[in-house]
């Protein structure tokens, strides 16, 4: 879904002495177009717009004015896409939503600059909310976001497998940060005295675990970002953490992560191993558990009004969480024990072969 950033004006001209003092010029407008190009490219790629849908869902409770709601949506959209630009560089990603990543087109330096520019474009929107506390909340959550990203990168680059507790802290900072920022800004503009942050914290963790699961299990995800991209990145995702820690003596999976492999057969081996340790099933169980927790929080928010609960549960759970669709899994691997006490895995090929066919011969629809 194409989105837009606040436009630059294109009227008038500047003298040399006026440079930097006005945005009402043709050169300024052209320069803006150049500076924002990596961001604009990303915004024009088709997406699910999950965060805007989440904001709209929460606004059924918070009921803030439309003008302020639009400002908050713009802030979150800018920050989210800025973080994606940087993520793709930091993760050496090749695809985003099925098309080349921005830095493959515009270069790393220009893409970093566009991402940083977007952070400040978002900050520039804050005064429109009319509450000085917005800047403090904005700063706090961006610090959380960078702390989470920093630890995620550190574990990957140092080949250190975190505990699940450390993972949840990282996710709360990194993924939950923008969810939390949106809801906190909305609460500033709302007359409601209820705190929705506990709910959004749970939703952030659900969203990330689901994303980690789909990265290794979804054919559609493979088409859009590449099959098993987390394995190529060397990322300690939720199923990978569980799999490694389920049998620390077996170093096969941790060794594969260090290789940053793009080899499909090696990735298939890794996915089969993760399945053999029950780690995908662990993801599904954790998502059911977290969804029940989210549901309990919503019941408390709804104060027993069943019609409200069902309405919001439908929006927040059915459209955003979708845990009940995570029933697809890799066919059970055939485990072959070797003389050394280790083992190799041979996943049954049918469904995984369909995934690989998608990866090796993707049908890409180019954004216009």
Swiss-Prot record:
Mg(2+) 2 binds at residues 87, 91. GO terms for biological process: alcohol biosynthetic process; mycotoxin biosynthetic process; terpenoid biosynthetic process. Pathway: Secondary metabolite biosynthesis; terpenoid biosynthesis. InterPro entries: Isoprenoid_synthase_dom_sf (IPR008949), Polyprenyl_synt (IPR000092), Polyprenyl_synt_CS (IPR033749). Keywords: Magnesium, Metal-binding, Transferase. Binds 3 Mg(2+) ions per subunit. It comes from the Eukaryota. Mg(2+) 1 binds at residues 87, 91. Pfam families: polyprenyl_synt (PF00348). The keyword Transferase applies. Its EC number is 2.5.1.-, 2.5.1.1, 2.5.1.29, 2.5.1.10. It is an enzyme of class 2 (transferase). It catalyses: isopentenyl diphosphate + dimethylallyl diphosphate = (2E)-geranyl diphosphate + diphosphate; isopentenyl diphosphate + (2E)-geranyl diphosphate = (2E,6E)-farnesyl diphosphate + diphosphate; isopentenyl diphosphate + (2E,6E)-farnesyl diphosphate = (2E,6E,10E)-geranylgeranyl diphosphate + diphosphate. Diterpenoid pyrones display various biological activities and FDDP E shows anti-HIV activity. FDDP D and FDDP E show also inhibitory activity of 42-mer-amyloid beta aggregation that is involved in the pathogenesis of Alzheimer's disease. Mg(2+) 3 binds at residue 211. Disruption phenotype: Reduces the production of both diterpenoid pyrones FDDP D and FDDP E. Its cofactor is Mg(2+). CDD domains: Trans_IPPS_HT. GO terms for molecular function: (2E,6E)-farnesyl diphosphate synthase activity; dimethylallyltranstransferase activity; geranylgeranyl diphosphate synthase activity; metal ion binding. Geranylgeranyl pyrophosphate synthase; part of the gene cluster that mediates the biosynthesis of diterpenoid pyrones. The first step of the pathway is the synthesis of the alpha-pyrone moiety by the polyketide synthase dpfgA via condensation of one acetyl-CoA starter unit with 3 malonyl-CoA units and 2 methylations. The alpha-pyrone is then combined with geranylgeranyl pyrophosphate (GGPP) formed by the GGPP synthase dpfgD through the action of the prenyltransferase dpfgC to yield a linear alpha-pyrone diterpenoid. Belongs to the FPP/GGPP synthase family. This is Geranylgeranyl pyrophosphate synthase dpfgD. It comes from Gibberella zeae (strain ATCC MYA-4620 / CBS 123657 / FGSC 9075 / NRRL 31084 / PH-1). The gene is dpfgD.
């Amino acid at each position: 879904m194409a989105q837009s950033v606040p436009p630059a004006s294109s009227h008038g001209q500047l003298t040399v002495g006026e440079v930097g003092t006005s945005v009402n010029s043709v050169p300024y407008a052209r320069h803006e177009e150049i500076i924002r190009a990596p961001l604009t490219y990303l915004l024009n790629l088709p997406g699910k717009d999950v965060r805007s849908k989440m904001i709209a869902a929460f606004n059924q409770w918070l009921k803030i004015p439309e003008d302020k709601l639009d400002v908050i949506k713009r802030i979150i959209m800018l920050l989210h896409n800025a973080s994606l630009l940087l993520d793709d560089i930091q993760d050496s990603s090749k695809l985003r939503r099925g098309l080349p990543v921005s830095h493959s087109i515009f270069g790393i330096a220009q893409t970093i600059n566009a991402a940083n520019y977007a952070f400040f474009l978002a900050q520039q929107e804050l005064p429109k909310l009319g509450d000085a506390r917005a800047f403090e909340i904005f700063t706090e959550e961006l610090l959380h976001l960078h702390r989470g990203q920093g630890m995620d990168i550190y574990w990957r680059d140092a080949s250190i497998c975190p505990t699940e507790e450390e993972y949840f802290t990282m996710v709360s900072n990194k993924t939950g940060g923008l969810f939390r920022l949106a809801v906190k800004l909305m609460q500033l503009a709302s007359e409601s005295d209820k705190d929705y942050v506990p709910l959004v914290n749970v939703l952030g963790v659900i969203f990330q675990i689901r994303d980690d699961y789909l990265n290794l299990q979804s054919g559609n995800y493979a088409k859009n970002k590449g099959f098993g991209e987390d394995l190529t990145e060397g990322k300690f995702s939720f199923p990978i953490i569980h799999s490694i820690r389920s049998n620390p003596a077996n170093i096969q999976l941790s060794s594969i992560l260090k290789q940053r492999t793009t080899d499909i057969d090696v990735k298939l081996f890794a996915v089969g191993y993760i399945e053999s340790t029950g780690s995908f099933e662990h993801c599904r169980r954790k998502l059911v558990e977290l969804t029940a927790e989210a549901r309990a929080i919503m019941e408390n928010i709804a104060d027993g009004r069943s019609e409200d609960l069902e309405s919001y549960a439908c929006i927040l759970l059915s459209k955003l969480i979708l845990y009940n669709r995570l029933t697809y899994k890799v066919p059970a691997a055939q485990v072959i024990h070797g003389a050394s006490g280790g083992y190799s895995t041979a996943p049954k090929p049918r469904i995984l072969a369909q995934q690989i066919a998608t990866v090796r011969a993707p049908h890409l629809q180019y954004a216009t």
